[in-house]
């Protein structure tokens, strides 16, 4: 295919040179606007592979219909905080302090960029809105969603009394920001004498807390928060599903791109072209309000493609830049997110050799790993342990004689942060609960032969079986291709 096309272009170019056409064409071309990269990609998007998408199973427990919103609404945050307060009340706690940005985002909806600058969120049971400690660069952002007051320091490291934006420029003493936080909470007021915190305090922090807030006990309630975050609400799952609509279309575009351009392109080009095309689709559909804050938060589709020996490394330290060739393993992978919700979506391919045949060893690894995906789907039932799911998958891998190609556990929990506990691992005895979300990665890797096959999706735990968020097939028709 590639040679024929190159020959046609070469012969056509010679003819144009001979006829003196090229010079005139260049003059005309210089006066015409050329299509942008995005427009060129739109023009070649055939949608052919989208016709192979799986239809939803009417007997399955999901996936849910996609959300029609771009992020979780403020009412959801308020209901979530109310649920958290009820759980705290069961332990006799009337106030909470969270310092993990993931917990702040989950509870309050305050999406922000995390750096070395500490931020914290405090709330009493009787407070209607959260109180924040925040740096100066976020002073507008923190007030734009749900704000009940707070204390601002200028930046890290903060000098006492220094607020250049107010015209106060001075080299004051370096401020201990944990003491700054405690002093702000003291002035705000604490309901009760116990504060739930999202992690244990260091002994040095406990000493400072005892001095600033005498008689107040700090209680680790991180187990409540991670338990809430692990079990997704219907609103979270609907937003998650929406992100996969775009993720699936990206997979179809990448597959069509490979089938169209074959061995003329690199894996890097496929990834970049697909990423540009699908994010143009995504951002054109979202309500971005001309760049206003709180619109389009944490929304993006990232596509990564690798071909050849790099597929044999679970977490490569080399770039994905290799020309696509026949007889190779290929992976199209990506991570999607709308309003922070979405996850991985990987498919493993085998490219036929020059004779149009598929390597038997690759077929074996591909088939066993694909079967493990289906096993995880069926085993993802409320009430079983993570360890049990991992045990059954690893036992199957050993029975099939592919144990030397096993490098890692079958899956990890999935959340806004990406990897989230619990883990489908032999040593994790956490009980699966309905609406927990997991990746799907029973990969097999053969570095000696330069091939590897790993998958992913979002598997949501159900009452009778799990369900997937993606509608991209796992079939030979989709994944075994000839170029």
Regions picked out by a protein language model, each given a short descriptive name:
Residues 2-483:
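Active-site neighborhoods and metal-handling regions in enzymes and metal-associated proteins
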């Amino acid at each position: 295919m590639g040679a024929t096309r190159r020959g046609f272009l070469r012969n056509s170019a010679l003819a144009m040179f001979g006829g003196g056409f090229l010079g005139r064409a260049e003059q005309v071309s210089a006066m015409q606007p050329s299509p942008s990269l995005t427009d060129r990609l739109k023009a070649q998007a055939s949608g052919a592979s989208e016709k192979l998408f799986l239809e939803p199973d009417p007997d399955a427990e999901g996936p849910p219909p996609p959300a029609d919103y771009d992020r979780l609404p403020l009412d959801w945050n308020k209901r979530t905080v109310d649920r958290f307060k009820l759980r705290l009340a069961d332990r006799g706690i009337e106030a909470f302090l969270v310092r993990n940005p993931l917990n702040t985002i989950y509870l309050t909806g305050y999406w922000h960029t995390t750096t070395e600058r500490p931020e914290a969120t405090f709330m009493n049971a009787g407070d209607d809105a959260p109180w924040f400690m925040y740096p100066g660069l976020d002073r507008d952002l923190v007030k734009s969603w749900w704000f009940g007051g707070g204390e601002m320091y200028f930046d890290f490291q903060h000098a006492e009394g220094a607020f250049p934006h107010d015209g106060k420029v001075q080299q004051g003493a370096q401020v201990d920001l944990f003491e700054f936080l405690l002093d702000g909470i003291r002035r705000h007021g604490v309901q009760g004498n116990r504060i739930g915190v999202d992690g244990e305090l260091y002994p040095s922090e406990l000493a400072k807390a005892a001095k600033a807030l005498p008689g107040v006990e700090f209680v680790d309630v991180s187990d409540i928060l991670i338990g809430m975050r692990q079990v997704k609400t219907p609103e979270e799952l609907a937003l998650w599903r929406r992100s996969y609509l775009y993720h699936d279309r990206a997979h179809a575009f990448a597959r069509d791109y490979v089938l169209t351009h074959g061995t003329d392109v690199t894996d890097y080009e496929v990834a970049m072209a697909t990423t540009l095309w699908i994010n143009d689709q995504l951002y054109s559909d979202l309500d971005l309000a001309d760049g206003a804050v709180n619109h389009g938060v944490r929304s993006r589709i990232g596509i990564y493609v690798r071909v050849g020996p790099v597929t044999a490394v679970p977490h490569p330290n080399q770039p994905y830049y290799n020309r696509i060739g026949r007889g190779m393993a290929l992976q199209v992978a990506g991570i999607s997110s709308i309003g922070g919700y979405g996850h991985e979506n990987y498919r493993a391919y085998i490219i036929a050799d020059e004779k149009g045949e598929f390597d038997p060893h690759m077929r074996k690894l591909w088939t066993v790993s694909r079967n493990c995906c289906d096993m995880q789907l069926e085993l993802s039932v409320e009430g079983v342990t993570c360890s049990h799911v991992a045990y059954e998958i690893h036992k199957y891998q050993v029975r099939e004689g592919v144990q030397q190609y096993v490098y890692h556990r079958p899956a990890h929990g999935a959340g806004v942060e990406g990897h989230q506990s619990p883990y489908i691992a032999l040593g994790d005895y956490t009980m699966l609960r309905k609406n927990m979300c997991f990746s799907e990665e029973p990969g097999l890797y053969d570095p000696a032969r330069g091939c590897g096959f790993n998958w992913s999706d979002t598997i949501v735990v159900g009452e009778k079986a799990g369900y997937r968020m993606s509608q991209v097939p796992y079939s030979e028709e989709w994944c075994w291709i000839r170029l």
